[in-house]
Amino acid sequence: MGCVSSCFRVEDIDEYMNPNSSVYRNCPCIRCLAHNFLNLYISVFRRGETRSLPSSVQATASITSSSSHDNFLSEAFRSTPRPLPYDADPRYFRSLVSRREKGSSHSHEEVEPLRSDSDADSESFGVGGCKWANNKSTLSDKDSKEEYSSKSSLRILRSRSKSIMADSENMYILSEDEDVCPTCLEEYTSENPKIVTKCSHHFHLSCIYEWMERSENCPVCGKVMEFNETP
């Protein structure tokens, strides 16, 4: 009890309040013992931390050094300019431009002959079409001319036949009216008298004999000739 009561003396309150004082460390009360044990544990734990601190510091230092090295390498890699690809080379661009210009000129030259050939074909086709049309027109003209000539020749033949028939009819009429032989168109004489047939047609005697050697029909009407001899 004396040691417990001695912990609560008023004059030693400052020493008991200071944990680093000898009175505080040598106090046999439970509160002071627990506090001293806690302080001892904290001091031991701090020593372990201080001993383990260099390894962690080394690890952090190695990490920082490696990170700084990586940063340096990345900065160096970034700082060094990347080489231009072959596509970005101005000489390559110039060569590409020249090639494209050559290709475009070559294609233009190829298109020009094609156009000229197509124009020539169209012109030749147009000329050929014109010639064909002209030939067709000339053929149609020839056909029309031939048709017209054939029609005109038929008309001429018909007109001639009509005129011949008219002339023969007129001849028969004249022969009957003028009393001449229809075969020789000569007058009757005593030496060559007139012979009249039953079909009422008259001829020279010599003419009718010559006719009868070839046919027995009347040369005018085509009937069989029968004679009526007149003195």
Curated annotation (Swiss-Prot):
Compartments reported by the entry: Cytoplasm
ZnF region ranges: RING-type: 181-222
PROSITE patterns xref list: ZF_RING_2 (PS50089)
EC number from the UniProt entry: 2.3.2.27
Residue numbers spanned by region Disordered: 103-125
Feature: compositional bias, Basic and acidic residues: 103-118
Major subcellular site: cytoplasm
GO MF annotation terms: transferase activity; zinc ion binding
SUPFAM superfamilies, per the entry: RING/U-box
Catalysis performed (reactions): S-ubiquitinyl-[E2 ubiquitin-conjugating enzyme]-L-cysteine + [acceptor protein]-L-lysine = [E2 ubiquitin-conjugating enzyme]-L-cysteine + N(6)-ubiquitinyl-[acceptor protein]-L-lysine
Annotated GO CC locations: cytoplasm
Main function: Mediates E2-dependent protein ubiquitination.
Name of the protein: E3 ubiquitin-protein ligase At3g02290
